[in-house]
C-alpha cells in the first residue's frame, strides 16, 4: 500500500459511498457518488442541476491531485447501453 493519504473533497462527506484501492501502487482512494455531489451543490449553493454538473466536471471530477485523487462514480441508468451512457456523459472520446 502507498504511504500517501487518500484525499477528500471538502464539503462532500455526505456523497462518500466507499473506498477502493487504485492499482498499481495499491493506493487507497475515497469513492464519491457524482449525483449526490450535484445534489449537495444544488441544496447548499442554490445551483441548478446543470450548473452543478458543469462546475464539478470542470473543477473536481477531471482534476488529478496525486495518487490519492478520489474516484467519482457516475451510475449508468438501468437499461441504457454503457457505450451510449459514456458518450453522453463524457463525450465522443470516452
Model-predicted segments: where are they?
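C-terminal alpha-helical interaction appendages
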Residues: 1-94
